[in-house]
Amino acid sequence: MAKYTEEQLYEIKEEAYTPQPDVLDAFNKMVDHVKEHAAAEFEKHKNLKWSNGDTYIDENGNERPYHHMNKRRGSRSGNKPNLRKKSTDGIKVDDDGWATLTKPKKSFGAEDGVEERNKFRESVKDIKVKPNNKNLGSSKAVDPRDAIAEKHTNTFNAFEALGDGDDSDDE
């Protein structure tokens, strides 16, 4: 299908031939009528969405639907403002213009247990835990008894069974 610009269509408009102008006028009237009908249907359905047909007469004598009284309070529908103040004491701007927030974290007794914490970390550094590899890929919880002590299992050794001929019934 050929595509034309708006200017080309306006240039061709004078040369265009409409064989039956009364048919074209009737078609345009029908299109306008359908547009009006569609707008009226939209308004009707829009009003039905918000009301069940109940109305009342207000103090000025106007008939109004009840739906405006069923709205939620304005304080519950909007976003709440952020009332926290942003502190500017920990912002450090470097020579490139980047601003970094360097705020020390607050902790209770941070200086009190530094040497105890370092001593504990040194003592725990050498402890190795053997994981239970059969459950690593699953979401199933690991049994703590398997991680603590590996259970001894009696296994069948084929080489011992073949190499030892004394147990057979050769008597």
Curated annotation (Swiss-Prot):
Where are the compositionally biased (Basic and acidic residues) regions? Answer: 86-95, 115-129
Q: Name one GO molecular function term.
A: eukaryotic initiation factor 4E binding
Alphabetized, the UniProt keywords read: Cytoplasm, Initiation factor, Phosphoprotein, Protein biosynthesis, Protein synthesis inhibitor, Translation regulation
Q: Where in the cell is it found?
A: Cytoplasm
- Coiled-coil residues are none
Question: Pfam families attached here?
Answer: CAF20
Asked if the record carries the keyword Cytoplasm, the reply is: yes
Q: Which GO terms describe its cellular component?
A: cytoplasm
Family to which the UniProt record says this protein belongs = Belongs to the CAF20 family.
Q: What does this protein do?
A: Acts as an inhibitor of cap-dependent translation. Competes with eIF4G1 and EAP1 for binding to eIF4E and interferes with the formation of the eIF4F complex, inhibiting translation and stabilizing mRNA.
Q: What is this protein called?
A: Cap-associated protein CAF20
- Provenance organism: Debaryomyces hansenii (strain ATCC 36239 / CBS 767 / BCRC 21394 / JCM 1990 / NBRC 0083 / IGC 2968)
Q: Which gene encodes it?
A: CAF20
